[in-house]
Each structure stands twice: as structure tokens, then as C-alpha cells.
Amino acid sequence: MSSKLPKKSEENLELPTFPASEESLSRSEKLKYVFVRNPFIPLGCLMTVGTFLASGYYIRRENHLMANKFMRYRVMSQGFTLAALAFSVLFIGPPRREAPSNSSGSINSEIKK
């Protein structure tokens, strides 16, 4: 009974590296990097904004029960966002940066300058 599933390897779990100079990236590339690195943080932000807007809608319609319910959902979505942020910091770690290119190939030459 052979399994057709690919074997997990550390190569598949590699996170993208952030370039040494952030000025070389466009906004869309930075946003793509954030979504790839931890998609739950932007998702939590969108959930928070959505529930906040929905509660505002129900406040204007004077449906205070639904407005209160969506305010509770907003607090839960903020908690989800903070949990995703904490998970990112604790388990994924800080973003890895590419090493700056050194023309001489030696660290000591940079120290002497």
C-alpha cells in the first residue's frame, strides 16, 4: 500500500526572504510578502473592519441588539488578529533578510573601512 502523497521536506517549508534594501520593492510586492508570510494578520484586520462597519450600519438603523452583537464580534476579531500577530512573532520569528553583497567577499575588509 504505497502512498501517493509527497513527502514533507524542509525545502517546502521555506519562508520567503525580505531583500536587504526595502526601497527596491513596490507596495504590491511588500503586501504580497506579508500575505505569504502570515495570511492571518491581514485576514484579522479585514474581519475587524468589516464587523466595525456592520455595527455602524446597525447603529444608524437603530437596531441596537444587532449593533451590540457586531461590536462583540469586533472584539473577537481583534483578539484573533492579536493572536495571529503573537503566533507570528513567537513561532515564525522576525523576517529574514538577504545578506548584503560584499564585493571583496570578506567580512574583515568591511570592518577595516
Curated annotation (Swiss-Prot):
- Transmembrane stretches in the record are 39-59, 75-95
| Gene Ontology cellular component terms for the protein in this record | mitochondrial inner membrane; mitochondrion
Q: Name one Pfam family in it.
A: HIG_1_N
Ranges for domain HIG1 come to: 12-103
GO terms (BP aspect): mitochondrial cytochrome c oxidase assembly; mitochondrial respirasome assembly
What's the protein's topology in the membrane? Multi-pass membrane protein
Q: Which residues form a coiled coil?
A: none
Tell me where it resides: Mitochondrion membrane
Q: List the disulfide bonds.
A: none
Alphabetically sorted, this entry's keywords are: Membrane, Mitochondrion, Transmembrane, Transmembrane helix
Instruction: List every stretch annotated Disordered.
Output: 1-27
The protein's matches in PANTHER family, at most eight in alphabetical order, are given as:
HIG1 DOMAIN FAMILY MEMBER 1A, HYPOXIA-INDUCBILE GENE 1 HIG1 -RELATED
- Identify this protein by name: HIG1 domain-containing protein C25B8.07c, mitochondrial
